[in-house]
Amino acid sequence: MAEYQKIPMQTPLVEMDGDEMTRILWKMIKDILILPYVDLKTEYYDLGLENRDRTDDRVTVESAMATKKYGVAVKCATITPNAARVEEYHLKEMWKSPNATIRAILDGTVFRTPIIVKGITPFIPSWKKPITIARHAYGDVYKNTEAAVPAGAKAELLITKADGSEEKHLIHDFKTSGIIQGMHNLDSSIESFARACFNFALDTKQDLWFATKDTISKKYDHRFKDIFQEIYDGEYQEKFQQAGIEYFYTLIDDAVARVVRSEGGYIWACKNYDGDVMSDMVATAFGSLAMMTSVLVSPDGTYEYEAAHGLSLIHISEPTRQEAIS
């Protein structure tokens, strides 16, 4: 029998290894499903927690820069350490999330799509095609500032401009004790998010929906709406028409109602918190939270394919952390 001709590769992809059980499964996937059939070329980076600690997390930055160079990366699940992990692994410090570091360098948007297979039936009967969630991965409640406010205090929003002038806005006069929260976002980040969404819609030939609550949040959410519309009108409207797809904006509550009634088959762009919640809801309603793809896409066309889940910690007992897996 003639030897199988492997699929050739010209440009290497960036391989980001992970932690614990993912290292075992990723090696099995390569050995059984990839290496016998593909002349695999990769630039390898070990993002295991021990190596991140050994390199003072430089390896994470280096892997992201390599991804910008080659354009494609595959990333395994990694540990974002908490206090218990710092003690367990004897870490120098509580290192940041590798995903957050990579997303910041690549300026990317996370697209998550349910995997539809026979035998797993969506809980919503009308859903026939996948619904892709595009989640803005910067700002909002995830980079907020919070404070407890005592009774009798007054909370104000103060903006100090470059020329030293100040702008104040009253948040609330607290007759009783309460809480406050400050959030922010950046025009540049919203613009990158919008372009990544529009480009992904063109690449996949799917309609793009975007939803906020601009009727209530007339500055914050409205800014998202305005930036999306400006970029669509100026850069993408003609391309969308040629591709036979559409961009559609609506309020977030209306979007939820439309999503439940729809057949699927589109991209739903969400702000950070909305995307965090809705991606889990959509995946679970399709039948399985674990059955979901996740890809980080940059406006310049860089792709990083990652696990849409964390680590299978329960599959690694304490003895197997110290001994070889049999």
Regions picked out by a protein language model, each given a short descriptive name:
Residues 5-11, 21-26, 30-56, 64-67:
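N-terminal alpha-helical transmembrane segments of multi-pass membrane transport
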Residues 10-28, 159-163, 169-250:
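Glycine-rich phosphate/diphosphate-binding loop of Rossmann-like nucleotide-binding domains
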Residues 25-27, 85-89, 143-147, 219-224, ...:
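Short acidic, glycine/serine/threonine-rich loops at helix termini
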Residues 50-166, 273-277:
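N-terminal glycine-rich phosphate/adenylate-binding segment common to multiple enzyme folds
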Residues 54-59, 218-228, 260-266, 273, ...:
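Short glycine/threonine-rich loop-to-helix capping motif typified by GTGT followed
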Residues 67-80, 238-307:
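Glycine-rich phosphate-binding loop
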Residues 305-313, 317:
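The feature captures the short pre-catalytic strand/loop hairpin that immediately precedes
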Residues 314-326:
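Single conserved hydrophobic/aromatic residue that forms the stacking wall/gate
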